[in-house]
């Protein structure tokens, strides 16, 4: 069973590139790989549409250590940035699960068609954001969803993220089993929107 714990945040206390990368490879990547064995089947209910996992490699890092790390799930075996995808990962103070459409997917101008109506029916608390390299986020409301969606459509570098953020001070971290169960439930809840985004592209 995959268990993400508060101890995982210690990876980001390493201040050098080599040390942090070593800790990411030793501590987080194995958990991401194990998580993928569960999440891929949750997303791949249609056997005609394969889902691939992509663990961040940080190959372009030469001096500064990565501020975050993740595993992404997409319908492309070659990568994930160019297509809608699901990302599960860490910053130094939070775990995130984002359904993401990055700027690289921009040629598909109608990629968000149908998403607003689906998002407003999600149970529980969710967040939206407009930039995957920034921690900034907003609670999921109709108004915030409209704002992020409009920005995505009108600003070239804007992105669209919808999902769940687990801050390090969230009480759920006291029960790693419950956290993992919640992540899986949210993957299932996001799957219809994931499928719609893939279809739109």
From Swiss-Prot:
InterPro entries: UPF0637, UPF0637_domain_sf. SUPFAM superfamilies: YktB/PF0168-like. Pfam families: DUF1054. Belongs to the UPF0637 family. This is UPF0637 protein LSEI_1198. The lineage of its organism: Bacteria, Bacillati, Bacillota, Bacilli, Lactobacillales.
